[in-house]
């Protein structure tokens, strides 16, 4: 898996398609303790002259506490060929155990962007 940094202001991106149909991964935590979850909802826009992604996460989700205890989280977008991996990330909770090995087997590798884990 290779990473490609894209500038959303230059990308022809349909947020309804990318978020609602292709899904995204929300990832929070730090290098040693992180979790990722699939989301098919969210909002992209501009607030106070800053580009934003707004996500609503239930307090019962394992990722919620990691988002609350860290200043940032990442949003990763994928093509349809990663559907199996995203489906797994949306159905298996990090509360149940470390799901990161299975995530790797499915072709997703975590990387750090600054202090934030991302896929």
Residue positions per predicted region:
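Active-site-proximal mixed secondary-structure blocks
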Residues: 1-119
């Amino acid at each position: 898996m290779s990473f490609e940094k894209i500038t959303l202001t230059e990308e022809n991106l349909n947020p309804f398609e990318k978020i609602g149909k292709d899904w995204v991964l929300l990832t929070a935590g730090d290098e040693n303790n992180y979790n990722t979850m699939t989301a098919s909802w969210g909002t992209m826009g501009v607030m106070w002259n800053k580009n934003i992604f707004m996500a609503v996460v239930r307090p019962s989700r394992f990722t919620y506490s990691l988002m609350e205890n860290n200043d940032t989280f990442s949003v990763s977008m994928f093509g349809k060929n990663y559907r199996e991996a995203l489906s797994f990330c949306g159905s298996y909770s990090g509360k149940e155990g470390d799901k990161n090995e299975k995530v790797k087997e499915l072709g997703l590798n975590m990387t750090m962007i600054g202090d934030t884990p991302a896929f």
